[in-house]
A protein has these predicted regions:
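Phosphate/pyrophosphate-binding loop motifs in nucleotide- or prenyl diphosphate-using proteins
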Residues: 6, 67, 127
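The feature marks the first
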Residues: 1-11
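A short amphipathic alpha-helical interaction element
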Residues: 2, 31, 63, 92, ...
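Feature responds to low-complexity, polar/acidic, surface-exposed segments characteristic
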Residues: 9-25, 33-58, 69-86, 94-116, ...
């Protein structure tokens, strides 16, 4: 589904590498591709670590313009840092407009006060994720390429 719809490419012509970790750049790029590669609202780049020739340049500018990410601080996006599961679900949650959720305590390892609590509760309610077990989401676990594709597939292909 992801390859056929241009959401992500493999790590080679014949390999997807599902267990390879997903960087912040890859996560935002995959979401941007799934959203149809919309034009960024602004070409103003606030990040010193996102160059104009980076493959993810427009995806990051789009994500910033849509309020999907603010970066890791005011001047850094940290594109090569490994994204965790909480960040990836939060990107998708913000993409859909951060709808209100009623139950923030879906998983035992997601504190109700965590920045990602609403995102995880929304993702569970919408079938985007069923966690890493019936009681855990593992928010700080590295997000793999397979996790990211599964989150996107469960939202966009339903």
């Amino acid at each position: 589904w992801a390859a056929a719809n241009g959401i992500t490419a493999g790590t080679s012509a014949t390999t997807f590498s599902p267990d390879q970790t997903c960087t912040r750049a890859q996560a935002v790029m995959s979401l941007w591709n799934a959203a149809g590669k919309p034009t960024p609202k602004s070409m103003n780049n606030p990040f010193v670590d996102v160059s104009e020739d980076a493959y993810y340049y427009q995806a990051v500018l789009w994500a910033v313009g849509e309020g999907i990410t603010n970066g890791t601080d005011d001047h850094h996006f940290s594109p090569n840092l490994t994204a965790n599961r909480a960040q990836c679900v939060t990107f998708l949650y913000r993409y859909v407009g951060a709808p209100a959720v009623e139950n923030k305590t879906t998983f035992a390892d997601v504190p109700a006060t965590a920045y990602y609590a609403d995102a995880v509760a929304w993702a569970a309610a919408e079938g985007v994720t069923n966690g890493t077990s019936s009681t855990t989401f593992s928010p700080l676990m590295n997000c793999t390429r397979a996790h990211m594709v599964r989150f996107l597939y469960n939202y966009f292909a339903k």
